[in-house]
Regions:
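Short, small/polar-rich loop/turn modules that mediate ligand/substrate recognition or access, typified
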Residues: 641-645, 724-726
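Canonical Rossmann dinucleotide-binding motif of NAD(H)/NADP(H)-dependent dehydrogenases/reductases
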Residues: 466-497
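Glycine-rich flexible loops
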Residues: 1-472
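Substrate-binding pocket helix/loop in short-chain dehydrogenase/reductase
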Residues: 563-575, 694
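Active-site helix of classical SDR
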Residues: 588, 625
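Short C-terminal tail/terminal secondary-structure segment
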Residues: 562, 713-714, 725-741
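Residue(s) in the substrate-gating loop at a strand-loop-helix junction
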Residues: 609
Length: 741
């Protein structure tokens, strides 16, 4: 067992390893990184990207060589769990302290941010966060600012100050309450003043926000943080047990037994409905916490209030959209309710913006919700990609925990006097209170959501890629052209589902493609082209994972190898036509069911062949099947337009890495064309011989590679070909006999 810092806890595990910390003792920044990673590893301690950590220590000034005090603090946008030493901003502490004399008051606090880069130590250029002065002005060497649900439950309670006094008495603590104040220079001075006014205090609860803790050493700071959070968890949970009340007023409905089936049926409609400004990716949460909230009596009221902690609503928006519905009403009624609620939600959001926007406010953003709560089903989150959608949903579940904690702390007589979150008594009416849970005033929420500093952060985000926000299913993605398509789409920002009859091959493809993307932006799926049910299940899995489908690509087919003896190919006719033609029709039909209710422009790309137009003998089943594909593409384009574009490519002799060219087919072709080879040559060597032979028969004299076909498919699948449908692009190096007419 590792040696750990002392500090008994009930819920949280003390992960501090004295031996590991001792090895980092000479590097204070490395030790700060270690502390930060431990804190960020547990979402009960702080949410993704939330909170920040800091240390103050001496470093030699790069100009004078003399030791100077510096502040190391988590840089803007960093996440504690994954922080590296390079993610911390380093600043001269004396320069930060000198800024107090430059401060012109709360109305001008945003201008102070421009001074932070001027305080940077040496060549450190990590962007300092808005919370930098909050750490700088506290007279402690090591400070943690965290957003644990248990602490925010206290911070968001109408009786929060009273309950904090009770907490301090119970645990022998001296934690101070501060009312709500937007993060910034003013709050930094309030923190400084609170510590000065309360000598010996060991933490601060920020109303409607979070928690500050500290220590004289890195280990003491860490232990103080987890001990405080753990005690707050015990305090909140004890109140919940003693209250005898049902969480959120009890259940109004039960979780739907078939919730995944209903979610799969409604998600494409819902995704399309909330993508009117820009396309989004979904995350579906049907955890116990999500269902308990969604199914509760109080969910409509609490949803309307919105979240409290600023970190929460920056992703969850001002409030989630609650859709009243019961399972026995059916999916059609749910669609109607979603449509009705969306109209109201957008109107309310525009009114919210109009009420508080000033001449210098950023422009109105997307008025669609990023979180949707549906009784019986759970919580749906939406964002630009899967990771952000998951985090958005996690943040709302954090908010659910906060609401549960705050309502559990409700006393029998309610809160007495002005709400403690209000810094000034005259503003207390701006805060809303429901069963002890206090939400931020809309005006304060607007000052966060449309803060010029937050807008600047959004503007610094990297440009989106060609297929960002798109979901692509690649059938036949386990090998050859399909594999290259999956890799290319992943590299260009798509969410990729690699579907193949050979699941191991599909998983291998995704394992490679994810290196061009991220772990959460794709998956492998089993798909049998001879089974409609298998196709439907693969598409259903895609919906539950990402929310819908935008692009369907099929590169899979079979080629019945001609028998050298000249035996009839008749036994292969039915199988070839089933897999190469009928399966494409069925795949398109199954996809169309989704695309029609999703109501977003979509694309289907099928794979034909030069053989479709070149008459010859020996491969009739394959050639005829590809001729049928050409016309199927045209028929589908007419039938599914204008919403869905349908196109295809017609490759020829793509030998490299192709499952269509197994060793026996390659040998058969080499024998057919009289190309010499040795029996002991590798399959790849034989393929290379055949590919070069084919290349010399084309106009361009260049072999056709899977990447060449993938590039054509990606063009047809993407917006650059938005006005092209019913078309087949040859990718054959120039075969005159295969010119399309």
């Amino acid at each position: 067992m590792p040696e750990t810092a002392t500090g008994a806890t009930k819920y949280l595990q003390n992960l501090w390893d004295e031996r590991e910390a001792a090895a980092l003792a000479a590097e204070p920044l490395a030790l700060l990184r270690y502390r930060s990673n431990l804190l960020g590893a547990d979402l009960r301690i702080t949410n993704f990207g939330g909170g920040n950590t800091s240390s103050k220590f001496e470093l030699p000034d790069p100009l004078t060589g003399r030791p100077v005090r510096v502040l190391a603090v988590k840089g803007s946008g960093g996440d504690l769990r994954s922080m590296t030493e390079g993610g911390f901003a380093l600043l001269y502490l004396d320069k930060l302290e000198a800024l107090i004399a430059r401060y012109r008051g709360e109305a001008h606090e945003d201008e102070m941010v421009s001074f932070y880069p001027l305080s940077a130590f040496g060549d450190n250029r990590v962007a300092a966060s808005i919370d930098t002065p909050l750490h700088a002005f506290l007279p402690f060497d090591h400070v943690d600012h965290l957003h644990p649900d248990w602490a925010i439950a206290l911070a968001a309670s109408a009786n929060g100050r009273e309950k904090l006094d009770e907490f301090n008495q119970r645990y022998g603590r001296h934690i101070v309450w501060l009312p709500w104040q937007r993060p910034g220079f003013e709050l930094a001075l309030m923190l400084q003043g609170a510590v000065a006014a309360h000598p010996g205090c060991d933490g601060i609860v920020l109303g409607s926000h979070g928690l500050f803790t500290w220590g004289d050493t890195q280990a003491e700071c860490y232990v103080n943080s987890i001990r405080t959070i753990d005690q707050m968890g015990e305090f909140v949970d004890d109140h919940a047990r003693r209250s005898g009340r049902s969480t959120f007023g009890g259940a109004a409905t039960a979780a739907a037994i078939d919730r995944d089936e209903v979610a799969a049926a409604i998600l494409p409609f819902l995704r399309g409905a909330v993508s009117t400004t820009r396309r989004v990716i979904a995350h579906y949460d049907r955890s116990d916490a999500a269902l308990a909230f969604a199914n509760s009596n109080w969910a409509p009221d609490l949803c309307a209030m919105g979240t409290s902690c600023p970190d929460h609503f920056l992703r969850t928006r001002i409030c989630p959209m609650f859709v009243g519905w019961k399972r026995d009403e059916g999916v059609a009624v749910l669609q109607e309710r979603i449509t009705e609620r969306l109209v109201a939600y957008r109107d309310e959001y525009v009114a919210y913006y109009t009420s508080f926007a000033t001449s210098d406010s950023p422009a109105l953003r997307d008025s669609n919700p990023s979180v949707v709560v549906i009784p019986g089903l759970g919580v749906f989150g939406f964002a630009k990609d899967k990771r952000e959608a998951r985090i958005t949903t996690e943040f709302f579940v954090n908010a659910i925990h906060v609401m549960a904690g705050a309502t559990a702390l409700e006393g029998s007589g309610g809160a007495a006097g002005p709400l403690p979150q209000a810094r000034r008594a005259e503003r207390t009416d701006e805060f809303t209170n429901f069963h002890n849970y206090v939400a931020l005033p809309r005006s304060e929420a607007f000052r966060i959501e449309y803060w010029a500093l937050e807008e600047a952060k959004l503007q610094r985000m990297p440009a989106e890629r060609e297929f960002s926000r798109k979901i692509a299913v690649i059938v036949g993605g386990g090998s050859g052209i399909g594999r290259e398509v999956a890799v290319q789409l992943a590299a260009r920002g798509a969410h990729v589902v690699v579907a193949d009859q050979n699941v191991a091959s599909a998983e291998e493809t995704w394992s490679h493609a994810r290196t061009k993307s991220s772990n959460e932006m794709g998956m492998a799926a089993a798909l049998d082209l001879t089974s409609r049910e298998s196709m439907a299940q693969a598409l259903r899995a895609t919906i539950l994972q990402f929310g819908g489908v935008d692009i369907v690509i099929n590169t899979a087919a079979i080629y019945p190898t001609p028998d050298p003896s000249g035996a009839s190919l008749e036994p292969m006719w039915s199988k070839t036509l089933t897999i190469n033609v009928t399966s494409n029709h069925v795949l398109a039909a199954e996809a169309a069911k989704i695309l029609k209710i999703q109501r977003l422009p979509a694309s289907i790309v099928l794979t034909s062949s030069a053989n479709a137009v070149v008459a010859k003998s020996g491969s009739e089943p394959y050639d005829v099947s590809k001729a049928a594909i050409n016309h199927l593409i045209r028929e589908l384009a007419v039938g599914l337009g204008p919403l869905v574009r349908v196109n295809g490519i017609a490759p020829a002799t793509v030998v490299a890495g192709s499952a269509m060219f197994p060793r026996d087919r390659v040998i058969s072709s080499l024998q057919k064309y009289g190309i010499a080879f040795a029996d002991d040559e590798s399959t790849e060597a034989l393929r290379a011989r055949l590919a070069e032979f084919y290349a010399q028969r084309t106009i361009t004299r260049r072999p056709i590679l899977p990447l060449d076909c993938a590039n054509a498919i990606c063009w047809l699948a993407g917006d650059q070909s938005a006005k092209t449908t019913g078309h087949v692009i040859p990718v054959d190096g120039g075969v005159a006999e295969a010119f399309l007419r």
